């Protein structure tokens, strides 16, 4: 829970956040559902990773909640997979109707078959290219994530999950 004081956001533990940043505490399930709904409505989001000291950004379309975690999917043969294994810190961004969401955190690989299959069940069109047992399908979930909802007309809302 947070409150505002003198145009600063002061958390109850005494730490400060930048002025005009409002932090909203919600239950994690609601936060992830809101993030996933936004990503799906936007249809495309952009995933940023690091390739050494060079940033890399590419379009993605998968976002799925499995076992209370926000997952994305890629192929092990892709550069993005190698980049995430070398440095799990990543950020995604999607834009729709003058609003955008950014989610920053660590993307952790989950090599369990049930996690891969859950993603493929959520996105049947992927089953033309991937299967849970093909040795290539890979899913990652966000850990220590911060989602920032922004627009051109309102102050950002920051949520953590």
Regions found by a protein language model. Give the residues of each.
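Short, surface-exposed beta-edge/turn micro-motifs
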Residues: 42-44, 59, 68-70, 87-90, ...
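General beta-strand recognition
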Residues: 46, 70-71, 102, 148
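A short, Trp-centered hydrophobic/proline-enriched beta-strand micro-motif
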Residues: 37-52, 90-93
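Short, basic, glycine/proline-bearing loop/turn elements
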Residues: 17-22, 46, 61-70
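A short mixed-secondary-structure module that forms the rim of ligand-binding clefts
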Residues: 63-97
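Charged, gly/pro-rich active-site loop segments
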Residues: 2-27, 102-161
């Amino acid at each position: 829970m947070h409150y505002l004081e003198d145009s600063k956001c002061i958390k109850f533990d005494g730490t400060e956040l930048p002025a005009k940043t409002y932090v909203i505490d919600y239950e994690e399930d609601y936060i992830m559902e809101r993030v996933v709904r936004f990503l799906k409505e936007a249809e495309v989001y952009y995933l940023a990773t690091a390739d050494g000291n060079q940033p890399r950004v590419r379009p993605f379309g998968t976002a799925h909640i499995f076992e209370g975690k926000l997952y994305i999917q890629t192929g092990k043969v892709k550069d993005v997979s190698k980049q995430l294994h070398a440095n799990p810190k990543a950020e995604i961004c999607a834009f729709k109707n003058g609003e955008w969401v950014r989610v920053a955190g660590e993307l952790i690989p989950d090599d369990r078959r049930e996690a891969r299959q859950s993603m493929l069940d959520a996105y049947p069109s992927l089953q033309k290219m991937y299967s849970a047992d093909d040795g290539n399908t890979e899913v990652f979930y966000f850990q220590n994530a911060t989602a920032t909802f922004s627009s051109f007309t309102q102050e950002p809302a920051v949520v953590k999950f």
